[in-house]
Amino acid sequence: MIDADGFRANVGIILANTQGQVLWAKRIGHNAWQFPQGGIDRGETPMDAMYRELWEEVGLHPRHVDLLAVTQDWLRYRLPKRYVRHGQYPLCIGQKQKWFLLRLDEPNTQHIRFDEGKAEFDNWQWVSYWYPLGQVIHFKRGVYRRALQELVPELPLQQGLIIPEQNNHLLQF
């Protein structure tokens, strides 16, 4: 679903373990890592889409996770011009996302799999909460920062998770 401004409705998933680390997934055929995310289908709520994407991309069911928080507003990013498909209608110039923070207890990590439906990832790892800010593709970095900052208070193990400075784009984790 693309809105009147050209932004595709989408959900992003930050899946945290009980140590406050987050699941960081590698896209098939690329040296690109990101959080699971995906589009909202017509008739779906963001929550419905999040659970569908959780199953399709990571192989987890709602019973495997606890929902901790959701971003209050839509977070938007624009695609660089080279990624915009100008022959497509309606024209999509970026994504607007609702971000979900989920907790996955250790026993349920055994259910993570990438062979459900059309696989998008082929590897994953647990990383520190702020690590993705220094690794994600540049045009998603602002949305990742806003989502992580908004959701960190809801992470049970937030002690010691310092919010990085806004202007520090060479983050070391």
Swiss-Prot record:
A motif (Nudix box) lies at residues 38-59. Keywords: Hydrolase. Pfam families: NUDIX (PF00293). It comes from the Bacteria. It is an enzyme of class 3 (hydrolase). Its EC number is 3.6.1.-. Residues 6-149 form the Nudix hydrolase domain. Its cofactor is a divalent metal cation. InterPro entries: Nudix_hydrolase, NUDIX_hydrolase-like_dom_sf, NUDIX_hydrolase_CS, NUDIX_hydrolase_dom, RppH. GO terms for molecular function: pyrophosphatase activity. Belongs to the Nudix hydrolase family. RppH subfamily. Accelerates the degradation of transcripts by removing pyrophosphate from the 5'-end of triphosphorylated RNA, leading to a more labile monophosphorylated state that can stimulate subsequent ribonuclease cleavage. NCBIfam families: PRK00714.1-1 (NF001934), PRK00714.1-4 (NF001937), PRK00714.1-5 (NF001938). This is RNA pyrophosphohydrolase.
